[in-house]
């Protein structure tokens, strides 16, 4: 495909997560978009704490609950449900921004934390 890794590659229509859900629609599989904005360097160093938020979305409440439980077993990581799977394109679009920031600031561990909102 080419181009800088910090550019967004739009998948029409929707997102990679929606495309996966469409491919799997005849199987008894529930798709949850997660971990898009968590550095692979962080994930490779579990159980070290990851001081980031993990945005998730999906169409099945139970599947999102399972994903959230897995995410929150990782020290420091917090799952934030942003809604249905049609929001996955938003999460996927953040990833190149985060990669670009990590490149610019010579880091492998940059991430996002949502502040100012009471999620309880």
Give the role of each language-model region.
Residues 1-2, 38-40:
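Short, catalytically relevant binding-site loops at active-site mouths
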Residues 3-13, 18, 22, 45-62:
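Short beta-strand and adjoining strand-loop segment in the mid-core
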Residues 25, 39-42:
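Rossmann-like dinucleotide/flavin-binding elements
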Residues 26-27, 73:
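Oxidoreductase and adenylate-handling cofactor-binding alpha/beta cores
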Residues 28-37:
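Conserved beta-loop-beta element that borders a ligand/cofactor-binding pocket
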Residues 52-120:
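Active-site-lining helix/loop region of Rossmann-like oxidoreductase modules
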């Amino acid at each position: 495909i080419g181009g800088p890794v910090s550019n967004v590659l739009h998948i029409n229509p929707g997102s990679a997560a929606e495309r996966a859900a469409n491919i799997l629609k005849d199987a008894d599989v529930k798709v949850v978009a997660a971990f898009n904005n968590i550095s692979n360097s962080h994930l490779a160093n579990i159980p070290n704490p990851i001081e980031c938020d993990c945005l998730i979305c999906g169409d099945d409440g139970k599947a999102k609950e399972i994903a959230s439980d897995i995410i929150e077993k990782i020290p420091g990581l917090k799952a934030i449900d942003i809604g249905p799977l049609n929001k996955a394109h938003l999460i996927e679009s953040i990833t190149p921004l985060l990669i670009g920031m990590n490149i610019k600031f010579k880091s492998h561990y940059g991430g996002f934390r949502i502040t100012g909102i009471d999620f309880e």
